[in-house]
């Protein structure tokens, strides 16, 4: 190998090291705990869901996020402790793959690799990631369906005002603003997702930043939101 070739190899190795180091230092400022309404998710899918959807909000994911963006993803794994099988029956209930429940594990693995790996040090390892989600949804009562139900907002297909939905969620989230995602199907706007946001420690609710803009297909209008 000539001098030119050696210089090229050294340069490429250096750039690779820089890339690895930069990817491992991508930070996050807060967590998004996003739950999806199964019925609306299946309505949005071109291929019918393999199983009948429940009229429930279940977990989409817990995502370390950046105020300034972009959000971190696919970060280096620092501590190896695989997901314990004893967690899986609970995860199957609160965190199903709505499109195909026979592929729950693939869904969980994807969420861990893309998002959970970036939650260090708050999220220590894979098992801790899933334990944290179970705790948030059940022990910390961040189940969006129950929060709405307490405010007498049930999944009966009625059309709701945005403010009524937001206020109901605020009552269960220390008066912090959630992030709502909607979709338009024909002339009907459906509520698809609700996100609760917490600080970097995952212990304290914060107002969710970055709401969908009016030009977004996921923007929720002030009235006539079907749930």
Curated annotation (Swiss-Prot):
Q: Which GO terms describe its cellular component?
A: extracellular region
| Gene3D superfamilies documented for this protein | Ribonuclease T2-like
SUPFAM superfamilies in the record, alphabetically?
Ribonuclease Rh-like
The UniProt record lists the EC number as 4.6.1.19
Signal sequence bounds: 1-27
Catalyzed reactions per annotation: a ribonucleotidyl-ribonucleotide-RNA + H2O = a 3'-end 3'-phospho-ribonucleotide-RNA + a 5'-end dephospho-ribonucleoside-RNA + H(+)
The entry's active site is 60 (proton donor), 111, 115 (proton acceptor)
> Which residues are reported to be glycosylated?
45, 143
In its UniProt record, which GO terms are filed under biological process?
A: RNA catabolic process
Give disulfide pairs as residue numbers: 42-49, 75-118, 182-220, 197-208
State the similarity comment: Belongs to the RNase T2 family.
Under the heading PANTHER family, the entry gives:
RIBONUCLEASE 3, RIBONUCLEASE T2
What's this chain's function?
Self-incompatibility (SI) is the inherited ability of a flowering plant to prevent self-fertilization by discriminating between self and non-self pollen during pollination. In many species, self-incompatibility is controlled by the single, multiallelic locus S.
What is this protein's name? Ribonuclease S-5
Write down the species: Pyrus pyrifolia (Chinese pear)
